[in-house]
Amino acid sequence: TVLSPLTAFADAEEQELNIAIFQGGYGDAYWNQMVELFEESHEGVKVNMTISPTIGDIIRPQIVAGNVPDFICLNDGGEDGVILSLIKEHALLNLNDVFDGENYAGTGTLRDDITDGILASSKCAPYGDGDIYLAPFNSGPQGLIYNKTFFDENNLEVPKTWDEFFALGDKVKDIDGRALFTYQGIYPGYMEEMLWPAIANECGEEALTKIANYEEGSFNNEGVLKALSHIKEIADKGYLLEGTVGMNHTESQTEMMLGKAAFITNGTWMENEMQDAPREDGFEFAMAPIPTENADDVH
């Protein structure tokens, strides 16, 4: 999520803009290009960018000391908790004017370019009043990454249901001993890519809204508990790659690419992030949706 306490700098003179950026799997090249273009189009403004995979830990003491960056790009679900703290403290600037302003192409407002429902969600409008305080900084699918070559060579079908998912775990173990699943261990936030779709499938988007709003009892209902039971079954029945919980993101992703596990949760950035990582022969990235209860359920 991106949050920004900035307005237009068209008339700025000799001003400095301090920005703090999370460096994820997409790399830093596009951020460097944006900084260059911004400085070219805003004469007199110098952009000081701090970019790091651990940017939350870097800026937390600065924020506590009252030295808050002008612009922050950081995952709202990060283990550092920075974004959640800023939301709780009502420390974010209202961004309605940004999205009601003209889009880059000059064909309408920026709001018109955003997929319906995103800006109204609790991710962007955390106080439920319709006002936007956080903005999405990228858009792309997330799901189960797997090696298409391995599936094709062994005539394996991508599982659509949870029953098929666990049955596949038995098949791949028999083929070459690989586990069904791994995840980014010490960064369990990646598991939300499996958790939230599973809950939405069981009991709808309303359940996610209740959870996001910390409503009492939001987890204690049959549908949510059923979704959680599927994820628990991965560990309880031996489908999780041994050692997963102690790995970081690149370690677990490498293990999966080496053929130690059939699936890992991730997004489209993994291909770029792991471009130089070792892998099993013929490895080809592919992505599948999270399993559903029934094969004809809508994702």
At which residue positions do the language-model features occur?
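Glycine-centered hinge/linker elements that transmit conformational signals in sensory
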Residues: 169-171, 213-245
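Short, well-ordered beta-strand elements
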Residues: 13-24, 45-50, 71, 133
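Short, solvent-exposed loop/beta-turn-alpha elements that line the ligand-binding surface or hinge
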Residues: 62, 94-114, 201-226, 276-279, ...
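Extracytoplasmic/periplasmic substrate-binding proteins
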Residues: 83-85, 194, 201-203, 229-299
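Short, low-complexity disordered leader/linker segments with a strong preference
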Residues: 1-18, 40
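Extracytoplasmic/periplasmic solute-binding protein
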Residues: 121-137, 142, 166-216, 261
